[in-house]
Each structure stands twice: as structure tokens, then as C-alpha cells.
């Protein structure tokens, strides 16, 4: 599992940590490992920072999420990132309830991989799960859907699984053409991925419908 936290809430060397800030945790005197691939680009960070107080917080944060998706996350393989960072805590500066790109990273992994990436703090050697701004995940999902071909899906995770299946199918085609051998294992895995995509899509639609009903009751 990957968790996220801030330097004030996680002061321990008991667990593997990675700074994902642009200055590698310098402001917190952090001496541990870093994962610069997830750091925000200075160009859009400056625009966002300079706009604080000049435009609405909602508009400004949406700009940040949009650029972070365009310039950082869309270039990365979520499965590779998860493998490399598994069993670690990703660190940045802001308190858990404040807008921060670590919350965008958590939302991205949860949306595409169907995993849980909790925000945590360390208290008397106990890991305590805390809250984070939920609107960040909603904004990211909206932006991702607006920037890719959903191919009839409503769930980004379902689309991700379907396209992974297509990649395996294409790989089998290429290898069979090159070697003359059968790669039924790849084709079977591709079939499983497409079936999983259909199940994820169905569950996503049900949850959306239930969410709408719950809001109407309120």
C-alpha cells in the first residue's frame, strides 16, 4: 500500500518515505529518498501561486489539477509508479486538509488502479488515517474524462483495463507474426481484462446511480 502525509505529521524513519515536492523536502530538512517524477513543474506552480487571492480558490486549484495532469500524470504509467512506490509514504508540506499535489497523486492511483491510497499521520508509533479534500478527486476525474476518448465507458478504471487488454492483444499479434508461435496466454489475459472492465463499469454505474439517489434524499 502507498500512503500520503506531510512532513509535520510523519516524522519517523521506521517506514520508507519519498519526498515528491519540487525541492525534495528541503524546507523540512528532509534527508530521505525522493521521487522527482511526481514533482509539479515550476512553470505552472508559479502561475498557481501568483494567482492566490487574485482569482477564486476553486478556479485556481482546478488550473493546477489540469496542468498537473497534462504535464506530469498523463506522462506516467500508474502501475509502474505504484510498483516503485509500494509500501511507502509520499511526503509533501501542506496539512492534510489543504490543497496539495500529493492528494492529486492519491486520486490518480485510486481512479485508475482501484486501490486505496490513504492520507495518514504517525501518532505514538501508530498509523492514523486522516481526511483529505475529496473535491480534488472529483476535479481530476472530470479533467481526465474531458481529455481522453472514453470509448463509451463512464469509468476511467474500466477504460484503463479495456485498453490494457487491447495492448496485450496487439502484443500477441506482433509476437505471433514475428515468431510463428501462438501466444494464447496473452490473449487469455486480454480477455480477462476486458471482462473485468465490463464488471468495473457496471459497478461504477450502480454506485453513481446510488450516489444521485442519496443526494436527492438529502
Feature locations, PLM:
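Residues lining hydrophobic/aromatic ligand-binding pockets adjacent to catalytic sites
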Residues: 1-135
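Serine/threonine-rich, low-complexity intrinsically disordered segments
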Residues: 129-132, 141, 181
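Short intrinsically disordered terminal tails
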Residues: 141-148, 202-218
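Charged, low-complexity interaction regions
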Residues: 148-153, 173-186, 209
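Short amphipathic alpha-helical heptad-repeat segments
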Residues: 154-169
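A compositionally biased, intrinsically disordered/low-complexity signal enriched
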Residues: 164, 174-175, 200
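The feature captures the hydrophobic core positions of alpha-helical coiled-coils
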Residues: 168, 172-175, 190-193
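Short, charge-rich amphipathic interface segments used for partner binding and complex assembly
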Residues: 182-206
Amino acid at each position: 500500500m502507498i500512503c500520503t502525509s506531510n512532513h509535520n505529521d510523519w516524522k519517523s524513519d521506521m517506514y520508507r518515505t519519498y519526498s515528491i515536492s519540487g525541492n525534495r523536502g528541503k524546507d523540512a530538512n528532509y534527508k530521505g529518498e525522493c521521487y522527482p517524477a511526481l514533482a509539479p513543474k515550476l512553470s505552472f506552480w508559479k502561475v498557481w501561486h501568483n494567482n492566490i487571492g487574485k482569482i477564486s480558490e476553486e478556479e485556481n486549484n482546478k488550473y493546477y489539477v489540469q496542468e498537473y495532469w497534462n504535464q506530469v500524470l498523463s506522462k506516467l504509467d500508474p502501475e509502474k509508479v505504484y510498483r516503485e512506490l509500494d509500501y511507502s509514504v509520499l511526503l509533501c508540506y501542506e496539512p492534510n486538509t489543504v490543497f496539495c499535489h500529493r492528494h492529486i497523486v492519491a486520486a490518480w492511483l485510486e481512479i485508475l488502479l482501484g486501490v486505496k491510497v490513504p492520507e495518514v499521520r504517525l501518532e505514538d508509533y501508530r498509523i492514523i488515517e486522516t481526511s483529505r479534500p475529496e473535491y480534488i478527486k472529483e476535479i481530476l476525474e472530470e479533467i481526465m474524462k474531458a481529455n481522453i476518448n472514453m470509448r463509451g465507458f463512464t469509468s476511467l478504471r474500466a477504460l484503463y483495463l479495456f485498453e490494457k487488454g487491447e495492448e496485450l492483444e496487439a502484443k500477441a499479434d506482433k509476437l505471433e507474426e514475428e515468431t510463428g508461435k501462438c501466444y494464447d496466454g496473452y490473449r487469455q489475459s486480454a480477455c480477462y481484462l476486458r471482462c473485468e472492465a465490463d464488471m468495473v463499469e457496471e459497478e461504477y454505474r450502480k454506485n453513481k446511480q446510488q450516489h444521485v439517489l442519496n443526494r436527492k434524499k438529502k
